[in-house]
Amino acid sequence: GLCTELDSHSPFCDGHSALLEGAHAMTAIQIISPKKLIEVALPLDAINIAAAKEKSIRHGHPSTLHLWWARRPLAAARAVIFGQLVNDPEDLWRCQNPGIEPNRQHRGHWTRERARLFKIIEDLVQWENTTNEKVLEAARVEIRRSWQESCELNKHHPLATDLFDLDKMPGLHDPFAGGGAIPLEAQRLGLEAYASDLNPVAVLINKGMIEIPPKFSGLPAVHPDARTARTLVAPDWKGASGLADDVRHFGQWMRDEAEKRIGHLYPKILVTKEMALERPDLKPFVGTRLTVLAWLWARTVKSPS
């Protein structure tokens, strides 16, 4: 309970006040936090070029999973998360050496370090490196190093055991995850990622990208063909490749079953000469039957006249 003037001399209130004062004293101790790279500089040109290029990519891109209206470029998300977690070399040095004036050698070192970190970002944002473990691990190493530096700077903080655990990286939570670019890239960079959203479509997208695949990471496919093949050659089920193989297998099975049951409702169309007159691109296919990509359905009503 809260203490009032009437019972302010009770032993409980004395203890309660001491607890409050102790908690206030602990939280009043400042956390030493070097500026992050994103607060100082980023290779924006490289990030912008990669983000623009990404718009034309379809195969293997999360945008093909389901439509989302405000997707953020994965390249930009990856670069921003990296920049938010990695310490700026200059400010780190100033935190480690308070009151000392830097010399020319120090400044030269900072310039070289920033250039090195920029190179990591420039490699990181390339679409071709999205699954390149060498590039991703180089970024993860820098993130872990910065966390270790922050833990060392705050090792004497009263709450260091809880706030600065060397063995537990900070997690990332995107409260309005939308298309899932931020939590997906955080997960790719080795962080424990959490996503939430008010829109059920966004929730489903994020479940399909960051919640379900990790549960099956490194596990083999379980469909019948995979079990048969496993006895001959044991495949290497890296990441969620086993889950992906199952999705492909059972997706094809569902398509084949649908073809058997309702395929007659969607017949192939015979390309005629008349059709080719309006569509010259169909001329090579005159006399053949082609699969229709889209059907337009319309209700028909018998005319009363």
Question: What are the residue ranges of the model-derived segments?
Answer:
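S-adenosyl-L-methionine-dependent nucleic acid methyltransferase catalytic domains
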Residues: G1-S305
